[in-house]
Swiss-Prot record:
<dbReference type="GO" id="GO:0042853">
    <property type="term" value="P:L-alanine catabolic process"/>
</dbReference>
<comment type="pathway">
    <text>Amino-acid degradation; L-alanine degradation via transaminase pathway; pyruvate from L-alanine: step 1/1.</text>
</comment>
<dbReference type="GO" id="GO:0005737">
    <property type="term" value="C:cytoplasm"/>
</dbReference>
<feature type="modified residue" description="N6-(pyridoxal phosphate)lysine">
    <location>
        <position position="11"/>
    </location>
</feature>
<keyword id="KW-0971">Glycation</keyword>
<keyword id="KW-0325">Glycoprotein</keyword>
<keyword id="KW-0663">Pyridoxal phosphate</keyword>
<comment type="function">
    <text>Catalyzes the reversible transamination between alanine and 2-oxoglutarate to form pyruvate and glutamate. Participates in cellular nitrogen metabolism and also in liver gluconeogenesis starting with precursors transported from skeletal muscles.</text>
</comment>
<keyword id="KW-0963">Cytoplasm</keyword>
<dbReference type="InterPro" id="IPR015421">
    <property type="entry name" value="PyrdxlP-dep_Trfase_major"/>
</dbReference>
<protein>
    <recommendedName>
        <fullName>Alanine aminotransferase 1</fullName>
        <ecNumber>2.6.1.2</ecNumber>
    </recommendedName>
</protein>
<comment type="subunit">
    <text>Homodimer.</text>
</comment>
<dbReference type="GO" id="GO:0004021">
    <property type="term" value="F:L-alanine:2-oxoglutarate aminotransferase activity"/>
</dbReference>
<comment type="similarity">
    <text>Belongs to the class-I pyridoxal-phosphate-dependent aminotransferase family. Alanine aminotransferase subfamily.</text>
</comment>
<keyword id="KW-0032">Aminotransferase</keyword>
<feature type="glycosylation site" description="N-linked (Glc) (glycation) lysine; in vitro">
    <location>
        <position position="11"/>
    </location>
</feature>
<keyword id="KW-0808">Transferase</keyword>
């Protein structure tokens, strides 16, 4: 369960970084 939360945050952070 915690892994999913971490994955979601990591994906959002990486996506935002790539978007900018």
């Amino acid at each position: 369960q915690e892994l999913a939360s971490f994955h979601s945050v990591s994906k959002g952070f990486m996506g935002e970084c790539g978007f900018r």
